[in-house]
Amino acid sequence: MWNNDVSISKQMRIGVVSYLNSKPLVEGLQSLLPKAILEFDTPSRLSTRMKSGEFDIGLIPSVEFLAWENSTFIGGIAVACYGQVQSVCIHSKKPLNQIRSMALDEGSKTSIALMRVIFEENNWKLDETKSFPMDGNPHDIHSDAVLLIGDRAMADYLPGFPFKMDLGEEWKRLTGLPFVFALWAVRPGLKLSAMEIKAFHEALNLGK
């Protein structure tokens, strides 16, 4: 259930993902919406905080958004890829088809869901998963592989993990389609003006 106690006001609260891949979407947004309050967090925490009523607008994981009722989004803007995404990758000690255990970055449920679809489509078996904290060190992992998102996923290769798969690239290989990781969700009951919507599109243009 949504918490709709937050009233609509000119000082809207905007939840933003604290990764480099979202920077093009927020470049200049504060100057375009000077009364807005921008707060940065991980995708999964933003989703929880927005649903509890902390944000009017949030850059929310697509899997989370699809499960929400009565919510809308700002069209034409997303964290998306058509092929390599670079910031959502599996780093593995073994060839991908030999992985049996994986540590999963706690920062994004969308990336975990995408990983599971990719494994199913490839008929790869995964017996064990565990959560990998945002401040965790990959070198402490005893699993066969680790799914990383955000800035720390962007290393070419991690020492001790000679195999790597970019999930955006693998999704395109399997389906030929782009993939949307996150979008600007708007809480139920909030009606954005044309100028406010335009500000988000202008921010994207500034970030390109």
Where are these regions (language model features)?
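Pocket-lining segment of extracytoplasmic ligand-binding domains
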Residues: 131-208
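Short, polar/charged alpha-helical segment
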Residues: 18-41
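Short helix-initiation/N-cap motifs at beta->coil->alpha
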Residues: 37-48, 124-144
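A bilobed periplasmic-binding-protein/Venus flytrap-type ligand-binding module shared by bacterial periplasmic
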Residues: 28, 88-96, 101, 179-195
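A conserved helix-loop-strand patch within extracytoplasmic ligand-binding domains
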Residues: 77-135, 165-166, 170-172
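Short, well-ordered beta-strand elements
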Residues: 8-18, 36-39, 100-105
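Beta->alpha turn/N-cap motifs
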Residues: 19-21, 42-43, 54-66, 77, ...
